[in-house]
């Protein structure tokens, strides 16, 4: 039996490509390559990091821009106007992402990394001239992940879970705009509460460079291309050739990061697992909260599933970029954000399957979905 595409629904998302499907494998390869680079050519990473302006590494900034821009150019911000037509799921995702999720991430990170696993994380590192324990540095990375709701791969999660992709696009647009204004103040406040001093100007500059600049470039170039080249050329040609650039930029950033952190990982492979514990629990906890709230609000499954999935997943590109700028490429905070990348795909695919298996809990409105649920299609139109 083959799933049927709904011709009436908004086309967004799709099946995972080779990179996205095996993201965990590529990150693991980057760990190996980065560690080898750090061991064999230790001067390379230091030289690259020395090319900086106001503590912003130019090579890394370039990589991070090309990692972020393809994500931003894919977002249709005109969909944000549609939020008034579906207020309940949009309000739900905003409340979860910006009122609940940041604080539960702090609680889980502090409990596991700052208390339970603290005896295993007693080493320190120097960040901006300040001696910081690895535990606190890892907590900072977790916080930066926790306040960055996913706006990219969630389209794929929504598609695979038979969700309302029109609503998913609305939530992506609204959360991206919210991130531009809320990420810096929330990050500053929560990091300060975790005994990590971050200059206000630095985190604002980080958001402007790694969110604002790609966002502005994405909005303008999307508008210009759609106006002069048309949607078909934009989707079939421009995005087709742009996606590999984002992949290469992400992989280069990860290789450089692990070139710095190679020795720590070789000596303490347990750290990767320890960081993954609060991230895994946070992802599942937020998913459960949002999913249950969607049930209580009497949302249809097609609206509740993407709301839960966008809350559960993280915008790891923004988190990596911010951690690198605030704490440095060789910081524990940057390493913690990469652990988020490492577990993202397998955990989210697990949650997609949970959504599909529990869809019967909710009222169904299958015609909203781009990929129709075969369980909701009449036998005669199954292919």
Swiss-Prot record:
Transmembrane segments: 25-45, 53-73, 103-123, 139-159, 166-186, 200-220, 238-258, 272-292, 309-329, 332-352
Chief subcellular location: membrane
The keyword Transport is assigned to this record: yes
Family: Belongs to the arsenical resistance-3 (ACR3) (TC 2.A.59) family.
Subcellular localization: Cell membrane
GO-annotated molecular function: antimonite transmembrane transporter activity; antiporter activity; arsenite transmembrane transporter activity
Entry's Gene Ontology cellular component terms: plasma membrane
Name of the featured protein: Uncharacterized transporter slr0944
Gene Ontology terms describing biological process: antimonite transmembrane transport; arsenite transport
Keywords, sorted A to Z: Cell membrane, Membrane, Transmembrane, Transmembrane helix, Transport
Membrane topology designation: Multi-pass membrane protein
InterPro entries, alphabetized: Arsenical-R_Acr3 (IPR004706), BilAc:Na_symport/Acr3 (IPR002657), Na+/solute_symporter_sf (IPR038770)
Species classification: Bacteria, Bacillati, Cyanobacteriota, Cyanophyceae, Synechococcales
Organism: Synechocystis sp. (strain ATCC 27184 / PCC 6803 / Kazusa)
């Amino acid at each position: 039996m083959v799933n049927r595409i709904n011709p009436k629904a908004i086309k967004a998302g799709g099946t995972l490509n080779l990179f996205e499907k095996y993201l965990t494998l590529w990150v693991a390869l980057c760990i190996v390559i980065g560690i080898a680079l750090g061991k064999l050519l230790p001067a390379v990473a230091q030289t690259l990091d020395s090319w900086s302006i106001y503590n912003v590494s130019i090579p890394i900034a370039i990589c991070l821009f090309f990692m972020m821009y393809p994500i931003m150019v894919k977002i249709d911000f005109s969909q944000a106007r549609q939020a008034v037509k579906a207020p309940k799921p949009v309000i739900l995702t905003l409340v979860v992402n910006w009122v609940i999720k940041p604080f539960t991430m702090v609680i889980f990170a502090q409990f596991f990394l700052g208390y339970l696993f603290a005896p295993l994380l007693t080493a320190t590192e120097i960040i901006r001239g300040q001696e910081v324990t690895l535990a606190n540095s890892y907590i900072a990375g977790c916080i930066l992940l926790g306040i960055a709701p996913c706006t990219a791969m969630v389209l794929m999660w929504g598609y695979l879970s038979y969700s309302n992709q029109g609503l998913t696009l609305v939530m992506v647009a609204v959360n991206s705009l919210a991130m531009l204004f809320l990420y810096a103040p929330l990050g500053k406040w929560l990091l300060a509460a975790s005994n990590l001093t971050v200059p206000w100007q630095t985190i604002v500059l980080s958001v402007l460079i790694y969110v604002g600049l790609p966002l502005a470039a994405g909005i303008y170039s999307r508008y210009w291309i759609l106006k002069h080249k048309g949607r078909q050329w934009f989707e079939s040609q421009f995005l087709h050739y742009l996606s590999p650039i984002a992949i290469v930029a992400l992989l280069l950033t990860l290789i450089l990061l692990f070139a710095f952190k190679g020795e720590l990982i070789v000596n303490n492979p347990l750290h990767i697992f320890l960081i993954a514990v609060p991230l895994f629990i946070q992802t599942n906890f937020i998913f459960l909260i949002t999913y249950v709230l969607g049930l209580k609000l009497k949302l249809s499954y097609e609206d509740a599933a993407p709301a839960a999935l966008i809350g559960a997943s993280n915008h790891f590109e923004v988190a990596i970029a911010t951690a690198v700028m605030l704490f440095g490429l060789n910081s524990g905070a940057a390493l913690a954000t990469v652990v988020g990348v490492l577990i993202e795909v397998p955990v989210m695919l697990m949650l997609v399957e949970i959504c599909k298996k529990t869809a019967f809990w909710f009222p169904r409105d299958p015609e909203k979905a781009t990929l129709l649920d075969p369980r909701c299609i009449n036998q005669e139109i199954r292919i």
